[in-house]
């Protein structure tokens, strides 16, 4: 098994972890139904950019 030669410093550990942060989801409110949904996605009611695109 591999064993490290030298201990990594707090600085190097922080530099490695700097890209691990999670981003919040970009949400939008539909103009027609007022429903909250993910950006660039159809709402649960089937609306996209104010128009009905899916019939349930």
From Swiss-Prot:
Residues 7-16 have a biased composition (Basic residues). The lineage of its organism: Bacteria, Pseudomonadati, Pseudomonadota, Gammaproteobacteria, Vibrionales. GO terms for molecular function: structural constituent of ribosome. GO terms for biological process: translation. This is Large ribosomal subunit protein bL32. Residues 1-28 are annotated as: Disordered. One of its GO terms (cellular component) is large ribosomal subunit. Belongs to the bacterial ribosomal protein bL32 family. Pfam families: Ribosomal_L32p (PF01783).
């Amino acid at each position: 098994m591999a064993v490290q030669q030298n201990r990594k410093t707090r600085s190097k550990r922080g530099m490695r972890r700097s890209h691990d942060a999670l981003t919040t989801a970009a949400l939008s409110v539909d103009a027609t139904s007022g429903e909250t949904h993910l950006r660039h996605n159809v709402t649960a009611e089937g609306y996209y950019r104010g128009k009905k695109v899916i019939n349930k």
